[in-house]
Amino acid sequence: MIRTLDDLEADGTALGVRIDINSPLSSDGLADDARLRAHVDTVEELCRRDARVALLAHQGRPGGDEFSDLERHAERLDELLDAPVEYCDSTFSAEARTRIDELDPGRAVLLENTRFYSEEYMSFEPSAAAETYLVSRLAPALDAYVNDAFATAHRSQPSVVGFPERLPAYAGRVMERELDVLGNIESSPEPRVYVLGGAKVDDSIAVARSVLERGLADSVLTAGIVGNAFLLADGVSLGAASAAVVNERSHEAVKQAGDLLDDFSHRIYMPRDVAVENDAGERVEHDLEDLPASTPAMDIGARTVAAYANILDDAGTAILNGPAGVFEDDRFETGTLELYKSATRAEQSIVGGGDTASALRKLGILEDFDHVSTGGGAALNMLTGETLVGVEALRE
């Protein structure tokens, strides 16, 4: 059993709330605040219920271009929330603990980037995570722990799995919604159609195998680099450029796709045509019979969109992960746009996080879907039936 905010006595309680606000940055702030907006419901509810909220989060990877403090995140949260949000430039120091202790009920403080401390970028067993400096120093200042960061639930890091070893633990509203939808795919309306695209070829093939073997998918539609891997496995000569792109992503993808086709060819659908860039820099669509092409496939073509739309029109549930092409380039956004529009006609439409959500946001159709996951890797892991350590840590 996992306790939720409905089970929490929040009034006056000091809460450590793990959120995921890892966002693209710009020179003057945040380039995208979607992840911050996702947690508004949880944080506002806790503040409205007079909790004293200490927010835990990370930004970027050590040494990366987007590795930074969380001051701009605190400023944006303060703008988004009805409740005031302060910023503390430390995470578990005496100052941080004092700031939590002195918080008035109904207020929040965003503590410093948890990844400023090397322990947070390591994996631990939960019992060992509870002994790290971050958890052992900060936990005594808290009465309970709330994990609302579904996007990090697959990472066995101290701020995810350590606190539940020391404190009563609860799922926030984002976590609760994600588990309710992604954890109950088997009871979603049938037929279930998975649309797998993007560049995470190995992950997508793993999802396809898992849902097909477990009987959760009636059809799997492939696109993007994933679709190209299946075409190559099926003997289609896409051209050296497309093959190189697939091999750069995974040396095993074509073999894995071929093995899956051997087992489930009747349920796996591949592109019928692709779009490439010609010498003039224009979009040109080619049927498979007209390949190979000298330039890499950048999108699916109109024939593929029409064929996939026919399947999606009859879908009870459409589960999408990954774009159909290089949607960032306006010349090659059509396949993703039209394919995803078709998916919204399903009785229930579910979108994985990461690049998929970014594509929908750029194309202006994000709000048309029933559920948009906040997690990329976590959503993929859950779709493959893997256990998420951050979720298991919340179980009583």
UniProtKB/Swiss-Prot annotation:
It catalyses: (2R)-3-phosphoglycerate + ATP = (2R)-3-phospho-glyceroyl phosphate + ADP. ATP binds at residues 328, 353-356. InterPro entries: Phosphoglycerate_kinase, Phosphoglycerate_kinase_N, Phosphoglycerate_kinase_sf. The keyword GTP-binding does not apply. GO terms for biological process: gluconeogenesis; glycolytic process. Substrate binds at residues 20-22, 35, 58-61, 115, 155. It is found in: Cytoplasm. Pfam families: PGK. Keywords: ATP-binding, Cytoplasm, Glycolysis, Kinase, Nucleotide-binding, Transferase. One of its GO terms (molecular function) is phosphoglycerate kinase activity. Pathway: Carbohydrate degradation; glycolysis; pyruvate from D-glyceraldehyde 3-phosphate: step 2/5. GO terms for cellular component: cytosol. Its EC number is 2.7.2.3. Monomer. Belongs to the phosphoglycerate kinase family. This is Phosphoglycerate kinase. It comes from Natronomonas pharaonis (strain ATCC 35678 / DSM 2160 / CIP 103997 / JCM 8858 / NBRC 14720 / NCIMB 2260 / Gabara) (Halobacterium pharaonis). The lineage of its organism: Archaea, Methanobacteriati, Methanobacteriota, Stenosarchaea group, Halobacteria.
